[in-house]
Amino acid sequence: MLAASGPGCKRGAVGPAGRSLYIHSVINLPRIPLLLGLLLLGGPAFGACADSPAPGVVWRRCLLDNADFSGRDLTGAILRDTSFARARFVEAKLAGIDGSDARFSFADMSRADLTGATLRSTDLTRAVLAAATLKGADLRRATLFRADLRGADLTGAELTGANLSGADFSGARWLDGEKICGAGSIGSCQ
């Protein structure tokens, strides 16, 4: 996250932890080459990454590792290409998010509502999704290597091409909504 102060800075949005953020003004001439370079190289848009967590927020190519969004409402948010490694989303409302190509490795998303979420090609390596609701979620080509999905609801989820190696599905409600995976369901529902 950007945090700066001094001449040429304007008070920005409140960050995920409730801290005020200061973002350099584009009027500050020495900053223009830096901003243009980041835009041309596809770097993060600072204003968007500093936006407060809220329904429909757009965070693209942001670095939000270790952030705590527990209990927050991010319904319908655009989180594409963003890194949330080791972030906390316990009991967060994430229904309808687009987290395609995002990184949630080691994130704690236990009891989160991910109904209808798009998580195509998303890295969920060792993520904790215990008791999470993933009804109708699109997890095509997602990496769920050693993810904890114990007790999760996967009714209607799409897992085509997903890496499920070592994922724990014990007690999870499987794709058809009828089958409950048995204890020790590692890598597949048994």
Identify the role of each PLM range.
Residues M1-L2, C9, Y22-S25:
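Short terminal hydrophobic/aromatic SLiMs and anchors at protein ends
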Residues A3-A4, A13, A17:
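Ala/Thr-enriched low-complexity intrinsically disordered regions
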Residues P7-R11, L38:
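Hydrophobic residues within membrane-embedded alpha helices
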Residues K10-A13, N28:
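Intrinsically disordered, low-complexity polyampholyte segments enriched for Lys and acidic residues
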Residues L21-L34:
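Bacterial N-terminal signal peptides that target proteins for export
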Residues G42-P44:
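N-terminal signal peptide c-region/cleavage motif recognized by signal peptidases
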Residues F46-Q190:
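Tandem repeat scaffolds
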